[in-house]
């Protein structure tokens, strides 16, 4: 199980990441584009995914971890429960979301160092 502090630590290790408030909750940005936001409940993370099909697949495969709400219908955005995701998986989710929003050059530099 990860905590808000774990999410913050993992997100802020990604290049160019800053933390700002979005809708009154912590959110993480890369070069001005958000890639993760902690929901008001404090134990759910909002993340973009590559496509709505991937969102549907995550929810169908692991509904204890991933879900959505009507607000996100029609959007390639999934919600992840902190309590159902370990730190390694959360790091992977954040990195994938970061890659979706990061400038291509920054992502390429990151991948070259990995």
What are these regions (language model features)?
Residues 1-114:
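Charge-dense, helix-prone N-terminal extensions
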């Amino acid at each position: 199980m990860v905590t808000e502090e774990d999410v913050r630590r993992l997100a802020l290790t990604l290049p160019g990441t800053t933390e700002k408030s979005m809708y009154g909750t912590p959110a993480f940005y890369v070069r001005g584009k958000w890639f993760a936001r902690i929901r008001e409940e404090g134990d759910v993370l909002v993340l973009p995914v590559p496509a709505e099909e991937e969102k549907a697949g995550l929810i169908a495969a692991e509904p204890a971890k991933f879900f959505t709400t009507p607000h996100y219908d029609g959007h390639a955005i999934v919600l992840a429960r902190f309590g159902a995701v370990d730190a390694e998986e959360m790091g992977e989710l954040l990195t994938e979301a970061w890659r979706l929003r990061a400038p291509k050059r920054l992502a390429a530099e990151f991948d070259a160092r990995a």
